[in-house]
From Swiss-Prot:
Name used for this protein in its record: Serpentine receptor class epsilon-8
Broad class of the protein's primary localization: membrane
Species in which this protein is naturally found: Caenorhabditis elegans
Residues spanning the membrane: 37-57, 64-86, 101-123, 143-163, 169-189, 235-255, 264-284
UniProt keyword Hydrolase present: no
Origin organism lineage: Eukaryota, Metazoa, Ecdysozoa, Nematoda, Chromadorea
Compartments where found: Membrane
Keyword Membrane: yes
Membrane topology: Multi-pass membrane protein
Family matches, as Pfam families: Sre
Signal peptide coordinates: none
Length: 341
């Protein structure tokens, strides 16, 4: 629903505080805003630590890291925009000096939320390309992959966000588009995972081992594809769940209901988006042992405790038991020599 109060433009979860005051709900609204501030503070701390892990701890391929940092970048802009909006809504701008900044913040937040809602397919495309270039993807950064994905993704999302803001397309069309894109991204990762599993098993078949038709780098990349598809499947479930919830709330703009009901749905959306932004990094963290190891190292450093060595694990993070290290080493290098001679 385009609002006359916003010059015939539509922003995601734009709440007119004048209407809230007229309804006598200012105290409740202010309380909810203060609770939201608490969530925002936690989100900032979480974001800064996540950024540190992305920069200094290599836990995935460069392209996947770059795409996740792009995902985090939109959340940073979204949080910054939301902080400006909340600051004004808490009554810190009685003379409306921040009017232009509020419009910019609403515009930026709407665009960033569109990026978050369309994000799933970019991870799917990156993993599909990693599967296609399996022979040398890990050895080469292939920066062009992430740049190509983002150069196509951002203009399309930006155009969609502008169409939403300018009321060129009905809300229901945007919501249907969100659903379709998210489902395609979710199914695509499952297909990519199944393909890599099948190919990985084929490489370990007796016929393939005897013919030695694969290289160690290719086998490693396949294992890496499978591992990261597992990680993405966990992250995707949370993204899909929250995207469906947020998109469903946006449908309130499509129906003729009381303005107060719409505003309460917007409040729910804001909290839903915050929980979304807090939960996804936690799920990603829980799926990456490298990040967990770095966190333990930092905690031990803070409390002055010596870091404890860890038992070796397999490619897929499973515990490995060595009864005789010499025998295990001989087996490994025997297999290595077979593939190189």
């Amino acid at each position: 629903m385009c609002s006359p109060s916003t010059s015939d433009v539509r922003f995601i979860t734009f709440v007119n505080t004048t209407y809230i005051e007229a309804e006598g709900l200012e105290a409740i609204f202010d309380l909810l805003l203060k609770i939201e501030v608490g969530f925002l503070v936690f989100s900032w701390i979480e974001f800064l630590y996540l950024f540190y892990l992305f920069i200094f701890i290599r836990s995935m391929h460069f392209n996947l890291t770059f795409l996740f940092m792009n995902y985090g970048g939109q959340y940073f802009c979204s949080m910054l925009s939301r902080c400006i909006i909340v600051y004004q809504q808490l009554g810190n701008d009685p003379n409306n000096d921040l009017h232009n900044w509020i419009l910019v913040a609403n515009f930026a937040r709407t665009v960033c939320l569109f990026i978050a809602m369309y994000i799933l397919p970019i991870f799917m495309i990156e993993r599909c390309l990693a599967s296609f270039f399996v022979k040398n993807y890990e050895k080469s950064r292939k920066i062009w992959v992430s740049l190509m994905i983002l150069s196509i993704f951002h203009p399309l999302v930006f155009a969609s966000a502008i169409a939403y803001i300018q009321c060129w397309i009905p809300v229901v069309v945007h919501v249907i588009s969100f659903f379709i894109v998210n489902i395609i991204g979710y199914i695509g990762i499952h297909i990519c995972y199944s393909y890599n599993i099948k190919k990985h098993r084929k490489f370990y078949s007796p016929q393939c081992i005897s013919r030695v038709t694969y290289g160690l780098s290719e086998r490693f990349q396949l294992a890496e594809n499978i591992k990261m598809c597992k990680v993405l499947k966990k992250v995707q479930i949370s993204i899909l769940f929250f995207n469906i919830g947020c998109c469903s709330i946006l449908l309130m703009d499509h129906f003729q209901v009381k303005m107060m009901i719409i505003y309460w749905s917007y409040v729910c959306f804001n909290f839903f988006a915050l929980v979304y932004g807090i939960t996804v990094p936690i799920i990603l963290y829980s799926a990456l042992p490298e990040w967990q190891k770095e966190t333990r190292r930092l905690l031990n450093l803070c409390i002055g405790r010596r870091n404890v060595g860890e038992e070796p694990k397999s490619t897929f993070g499973e515990q490995m038991i060595y009864n005789d290290h010499a025998i295990e080493s001989n087996i490994y290098f025997t297999q290595f020599n077979k593939t190189t001679h």
